[in-house]
Amino acid sequence: MQSFTKEVVLAAASGHYNEIATRFLPMLSLAVSRPGRHVPDPFRAGSKDGFRVFKDFNIKGKMIFNQAFGETNKVMDVWELMDTLGISKNFNDALEQVGSFLGCERTGFHIKGTSYQPIDKKRQEEALAAAKQAAAKVEAEAKKAEEERYSKGEAAIQKQLAMTIPLTVKDPRCKPVFDYFENRGLGMLKYAPESLFKDLRYSPRTPYFENGKVTGYYDALVSIVHSNNKVWSLHRIFLLNGQKAPVSSAKKVMTPKFDGKDTSRFIRLGDVPEHGIIGIAEGIETALSCFCGTRLPVWSAISATFLEEFTPPKNVKAVIIFADKDKSEVGQKSAEILRKRLLEKGIKAWVCLPKSEIPQGSHGIDWNDELKQKGVFGFPDPIKLFEFITDKLQKK
C-alpha cells in the first residue's frame, strides 16, 4: 500500500488544523476556539494563562506553552505534540493518521509498520463536519464562561474603585504612594500638575489574593486602564513602607470588564497638550520618569505586548516611544513595531532608548534606572526635543 507524502499531507492540513486538533488533540479545543489568546495550560494544573495557539493556528498549526516539557516559552506544532503525547509513533505515523482523516491521495512509498486505510470523500466530510460541530460547542461554552468572567471582573473593579481616593499630594492619606515615588527617584512628582494623576488613585488596606485566598492587606497605587475610551481594568501596585510589597506579584492587572483584544490598552498620565505631542512607555514608573525628564505627558502601556498595540487619541500628532533596553531586545523590537504602525497611520513617531549600558547581571535597563543614575540629564534636552518634533511636524 502506498503512503502519504509529507508535501501532500502538509498542504492539505494547512487551513484545517482546527479540525485536526479537535480530532487528535481535543485538549486544545478551548485554545483553538480563541486563537492568539492565553488560556489555561491543558497539561499544567493551576495554570490560568500558560498556553495559547497562534492567531494563524488554522494555517500553520503552531502553539506556545509558558512552561512545558522542561522548557520556557516552548513553541510546538501539532505534529510534535502528537509525537510527544504518544498519539503518533513518529512523524510518518502522524502523516498517516492525519492524511487518512483528511482523505489525502496516497502517492508515496509504503511505510513499514503502518496500516491506516484511506477514507472516502463522504467519510472525510462527515469527520470534518463533526470536528467543526465540536469546536463550535467548545467556542459557545468558552464565550459563556468569558461573559461570566467579565461580569465578575466589572463587579470587582467597581468594588476596588469604591475603596480608593484620588491621588494628590495635598491629601496626607496618599503619603504611602508618594513615599514609593520618592524611593523610585520620582520625588519631584510632588510638584507635578494635578492633571498628571487624574487616572491614579490610592487604596488603603487593599486585599492581596494568592490562589484565590487573601494573604495580606497592603497600600496600593491603583491606575485606571483605558480601552476604546472606556475603563477596561485596574492596574495595582501593592506597597509596604514605601516599597513594593513582599509578595509574588506586587503588580497586578484585575480581570477586565470586557475583551478589549482589538483595541489599545493604556494608562493615561496627563492630558494630550494642544501641540499634540505625547510619549508612551511600558511601566508606570518608567512613564512617570520620562515625564520628570522631559515634562511631556508620557502614558503607560503596561507591557511590551500592549505597547505594540498602542493607538493614541485622534488629537495626537506625534509620539515618542520611550523603550526599555533589554538584553533580549523585546522592548526595542516592540517599540519598533509600534513606530512603524504609527507611521502607517500618519502619526510621527520616534524610538528613544536609554544611553546607559545594561549592567552586568541585569536583564535590561529602563528610563527609571536612567533617572535614578543621572537625573534629568539622562534624558534628551526638553527644549531641543520639542523644537525637533515641532520642526518635523511643520515639514509634514
Task: Name each model-derived stretch.
Residues 1-16, 73-76, 275-276, 284-396:
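TOPRIM fold recognition
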Residues 1-121, 190, 388-396:
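N-terminal structured subdomain of primase-like DNA metabolism proteins
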Residues 187-216:
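Short, basic/aromatic recognition patches
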Residues 41, 67-68, 82, 181, ...:
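Terminal peptide-recognition signature
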Residues 20, 176-187, 233, 289:
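Amphipathic alpha-helical segments that form well-ordered structural scaffolds
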Residues 95-168:
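Conserved active-site segments centered on acidic
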Residues 206-314:
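Phosphate-handling DNA/RNA-contact segment within nucleic-acid enzymes
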Residues 10, 157-178, 209-216:
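A short, highly charged nucleic-acid-interacting micro-segment common to nuclease
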